[in-house]
Amino acid sequence: MSFVTTIKQQFEANENVAYGKKQSDYLKNNFPFYGIPTTKRREILKDALLLHKEEVSTNFRAICWELFQLPQREMHHAAIDIFLKEIKNKYQIEDIVLIEKLLLTNSWWDSVDTLAKYALGGYLKAFPEKTLEIIEKFSNADSMWLNRTAIIFQLGYKERTDFELLRSECEKHKHSTEFFIQKAIGWALREYGSVNPTAVLHYVNSTNLKPLSKKEAIRKII
């Protein structure tokens, strides 16, 4: 039995239709859910990984992509958990292809934000020389989710944040009417404001951000 088959069987065995409906409602009914709480889902995943340790270690990229193409949202979250666990210190230059595919498949804030911060953020720490090329591509893409990713990928960078790049992304997208873009700008600025509040305040006060972006950017500074 393959890893994916094991996960399917265990998720189906733990399905809770009523809770799944609530989870689906929370994400605007974009995805069906088995109705498995996060803690239980991760317990199931942990047990399955122990049973299929060698298969997953060898083929985790293909497994993640297979899971991400299934309809249930728990499958997508399992794929992300596996990818982030297995990819540590194993990034390859071509992994950007898979990361972009995951960002563009079954996209919503809950998957995109995790992939942006940890998958792309980790990849660009491993290959910093690719940063400008990839962020320019994502920033100019027709996909709002890739645009959001270009803005928030530095969320975990703290003092290592390239503030010039962040400002550039904010300037490029500050007139967007997309809720998720306005929130992304505010979130990214707020996170950097935790280590450099003076720079963030100066930027916010000297540029014409949308009200939501400005509110989100300064709400922990002022």
Question: Could you describe each region identified by the protein language model?
Answer:
Residues M1-I222:
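Alpha-helical scaffold domains
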